[in-house]
Each structure stands twice: as structure tokens, then as C-alpha cells.
Regions:
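Rossmann-fold NAD(P)-dependent oxidoreductase module
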Residues: 15, 19, 104, 150
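NAD(P)+-binding Rossmann beta1-loop-alpha1 motif at the extreme N-terminus of oxidoreductases
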Residues: 1-35
């Protein structure tokens, strides 16, 4: 059993916290208030960033001490939203939220994952007709191995998990969010994910 703090209690945070609890982990969910986030992060071994991507960097910078030496699982995409509320552009073009978090929190092991799918697929990958792919981006091999284990706890088969390399590769997976509005307008909010077929 691992002590996990999920920062963000929206649809993504709620979905992940319920599934991780069901997998036997000790999960604390924190809302957007700084005090709750700091308390949850301080007592956790692993912290999941499920806060809105546009404000994640500012929120997590305030937790620098609480996050030091810990694994930060970043599942957010930092976007500029259009009038319909769907992503219309990237907040960090040419970079990524994951890269900015790692640069700002050098004592924290940032691992980017689960950001290339509708939130329902994060914890129910077998619900799709085609096998989905989940990606890992991060500098620390040990941290990525731990996160790989969490993904397996969430129902991801080993051969569905692809390690892309360092945190610089998060730029590619975060850019994939620009597909989302077109997919939703075409097919609605039916569950979907990127998939690498070999």
C-alpha cells in the first residue's frame, strides 16, 4: 500500500482517487485550497497532479518543500481554451507543463502520463475496443518504474505502457491534446485514447 495524494477533486482527480483506493492504496484527495494541498502532499509518498493545467505550475511551486524528494505524477495538459471551453492551443508551445514542473521543482521526480485520453479511460483501459497506449515521460528511471506499477494497478497491461524517455518527450504527448476538440466535435464524449499499433 502506497500513500498517495491526489491534488484536484474534479472529474480527473475523483476518477483516479477512487480507482487507486480500490487498488488498495491509501489515498488523500485535496481540493484547490493551498492548505489542503500542502497537508496532503506532505504526508504522501506519491503526489498526483490533477489540477487544471493552466494553473498547475503556480499551485505546485507553492508546494516545493512538500514535494521535495517525491514522485509527482503529472496527468494535466496546460492549454489555452476556446470559447466552447475546449483546448484551442498550448500554454507552453515548444515546451510542456511537465518540463516546466521539472525545471521549477528540481528535487522532485516528475513523471508525465495518462494525458492522451479521455479521463474515463485512465482507470478503465480495457473498456475500449482497441488496446490503448499510455506513455511515460520523466528523468528518473526508478520513478517511472513506480508509476508503471500504479498504471498496472489501474488496469493497464504491461505491453500497453510505452516509456518515451526524458521529460522533454512530454512536449509531444501534451501536444496531442489539440486532437481532442476535433474528436469530441466529431464523435462526442465517447471514451477515446491514443494507441500505438505494432
Amino acid at each position: 500500500m502506497t500513500k498517495i495524494a491526489v491534488l484536484g477533486n474534479g472529474r480527473v482527480g475523483g476518477t483516479l482517487s477512487a480507482a487507486l483506493t480500490g487498488a488498495g492504496h491509501d489515498v488523500t484527495v485535496a481540493d484547490s485550497s493551498p492548505g489542503a494541498a500542502a497537508e496532503a502532499a506532505l504526508g504522501a509518498q506519491i503526489v498526483v497532479n490533477a489540477t487544471p493545467g493552466a494553473s498547475s505550475l503556480e499551485r505546485l511551486l507553492a508546494l516545493r518543500e512538500e514535494l521535495d524528494g517525491k514522485i509527482l505524477v503529472d496527468v494535466s495538459n496546460a492549454t489555452v481554451d476556446g470559447p466552447d471551453g475546449l483546448p484551442a492551443g498550448l500554454l507552453y508551445p515548444g515546451s510542456s507543463l511537465g518540463r516546466h514542473l521539472q525545471d521549477a521543482l528540481p528535487g522532485t521526480h516528475v513523471v508525465k502520463t495518462l494525458n492522451t485520453m479521455l479521463f474515463t479511460v485512465m482507470t478503465a483501459p480495457t473498456a475500449l475496443a482497441q488496446s490503448p497506449t499510455v506513455f511515460l515521460s520523466g528523468e528518473d528511471a526508478g520513478a517511472k518504474q513506480v508509476v508503471r506499477g500504479l498504471l498496472e494497478d489501474l488496469g493497464w497491461h504491461q505491453d500497453w505502457i510505452t516509456d518515451l524517455g526524458g521529460i522533454e518527450t512530454a512536449q509531444a504527448t501534451e501536444a496531442a491534446v489539440l486532437f481532442v476538440p476535433h474528436v469530441i466535435r466529431s464523435s462526442g464524449f465517447a471514451p477515446f485514447a491514443l494507441s500505438i499499433s505494432r
